[in-house]
Structures are given as C-alpha cells and as structure tokens.
Amino acid sequence: MNLVLNNFTYTSFIKKKISKPKNLKQLTKLLKKKHTIIGSKRSYGDSFIGNYSNISMLNFDKIIDLNTKEGIIEVQSGTTLDSINKVTIPKGLILDCSPGCKYVSVGGMISNNISGKLSNKNYIINKIISITILDKNFKLKYCSQKKNRKFFKLVIGGRGKVGPIISAVLKLKKINSDKIVQKAYHFNNYNDFNKNIKLIKVNEYCVVWINFLKKNFSGLFLCGNHLNYKGSLKYKNNDFKLPSLILSILSYLVNTKTFTILFNCLFRLSNFIKREKTVHLVDYYFPQNKIINWNEIFKKNGFVQFHFYFEKKNLLKIITYIKKIFDENKLYSNFAILKFHNISKKKNKLSLSLDIPIKNNFKLIKKIVNKIVLKHKLEVNLAKDILLNNLNNKTLLSNNIFEIKNKK
C-alpha cells in the first residue's frame, strides 16, 4: 500500500509503500531489496525518509523479559517507550535517559543515540546492555560493550545502516515514587548562568531554557530530582488530541512572532510564579505529549529544529551570533533548550535545539543555518536535521554527532 510518508515536522514528504513484517522470515525477504528502516516516524528531520521501500519494525513490539530485581528489561525494537513505561513505572523502574517524546520506538532511540534531560551520561548508549540485530548475511548478531564491541558502537547512532535492530536489553533506574520535584532557577546574564552551572552536578536532571527573544543572555535552569521517600507508583496517561477546528485555527497563529512571544512569556511566567513544584514523572519527561497531535498545528507550513553541539567555552559567542543573524534576517525561535552531555571524562559538550517556524522562508532558514554551522564548526544531530548541505563522512558513525565540512 502506497502512503504519503512525512516526517514529524511536515517538512519532508514521499509517497512510498510501507511494509510491516511480523516475523524474521518476512523481514529477511524484504531486506533483500533496497530499503529504509523506519520506526514510529517521530524524527524531526528527514533521516528515515528514503528513496526505496520502507520497512516498519513496529510489529516487533514485544516486551521479552523484565527483571525487576536487577532493573533490566529486554524488548523488541518496535516497542514504544510508552509501552515500556506502562509496565515498568508501577514496578518502581524507569528508563531515565528518555527523549521528550514517549511514542518513539526503542529501535529509533538506539539508532539515533537519543539524549534526555540527565545531568550526567545523557545518551541512551549508557543504558544499553546489549543489542541483537540482523546482519548483512541475515543472521542474528549479538553485540554489547564486551562482545562485538566495535559493532555495538556502530549500531548505536547508525540509523539502521548496519542492519535492523531486533531487540535490546536496557538498564532501568529504580525509583521509590512516580513523582519528580522540579525547581526553576532564573538567570539574566552570562555571569548568572555561570554561577548556576554547578546545578548540573547536584541534580539528577537539568536542562536550560534560553529566552531567544531577548538580546541579553537570560533564561531558566530547570532541574529535577526523584522523590526519595516511598510514594505511589502509577502510570499516568491523560493525553488527548486537539479537534480539527482548533488545529486549523492555531495553524494560522503558530508561525507568527506574536504567538512565539506569548508562548515564551507564559512559559517564563509559569516557572517564575511556581519555582518549585512536584509533578508526575510522565509529565516531567514528556510535557509535549499531553497533546498527542500537537505537531499537526504546524501542518500548514511546517517547522524545523536546528540541534547542534559545541564546547561550553563557545556558548556565549555562538548564541550572540545566532541572535544577531536571526534578527537581521527576521528569523526567530519558538523554543530554545540547552542540554548537557558527557562525551567522555575529558570531553564535555553542550547542545542547543532551536525550533524555527517556517513562513515561506525555508530557503533562507537553510542558508542561515549552514552559515552558522560552517562559521562555528558545529556538530549536528541528524535525527533533527533537514537543513545542512554537506556532511563529513569521516564522522558519520561517531555516536550521533556529525561534523560538517564546507561545501566545495
């Protein structure tokens, strides 16, 4: 069946057949032709949209085993994070390195080496014990940090190029409660930001919202910690869909600067009035999923997310430059989030994601983003990218961080 396949941000479309094998025999047959492996289609970029047949792994959705004593779960690659949480949260377990969307598949998380809100070891690779894939000879291949280690690292962040992931064994965090205490810390300049940077060492979770509408360097540290005392352990799902009429009305407003100003002001105000609050961990991990179809608000024009990595010493210089060039070209970011990443003991990096609404200016956005990347030699997350002209193939398998080289 031919379907119109689109990415999550409605910026890439292709009319192709989607095959959904139910077992290894059917999967092997499909793999003999040129193909692209897809999961839940939640990528912001175009990395899962190929020119050949599309193979969905969503029928490989079984939870194979759960060891509550050791905090270990084995799942098939098509299992969604939401399905895992339904089972693990009532048992006092959680995958604490989780992306902002709970409807992603395990295979998608691993193939993109996703990051979460953790202050330390903020990549899914740190939670993976082992992976089983179907290799180029159509044989099941087991790999881990100890066995087939090189292969293991190629699979993580490899976007299905090494072979489809069949299953994975993941390490879960033990929790006493389904609640997280979130605290907001405001800063109004770069010196304040530096004073608060110590927060990443004393909190389990920490991200930074940056006010991209102001010329000065201001924003919020949003820190979180699990409640230590025993409490309720319930899964929560009060997600809902917006009706078509509301989506249609919002689609005319969402890509305007007025909407962006209002949204960011309300976000800042809500965290200023209530600087400390206790929330359910599902609401903390996945705030955007309260509205299941929120991305359809952007269906009319789409939006892009520019997600890049850099060293902390360059933070102020990069953000100042981006704000300046955005202002000169009448571009703006709906939402800006800064994350912390420990690549190794000697290598610590930050990442910044900017949601940029499209208003018949996609070519301009692409031109400006490429200029920023090349000027500051940034690294990018291809799961979010649809803007870049050229990649350096030497870094293609560097665990989800891809360096850009100048286009000749």
Map each language-model feature to its residues:
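C-terminal substrate-binding/cap subdomain adjacent to the FAD-binding core in PCMH-type
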Residues: 111, 129-317, 321-324, 328, ...
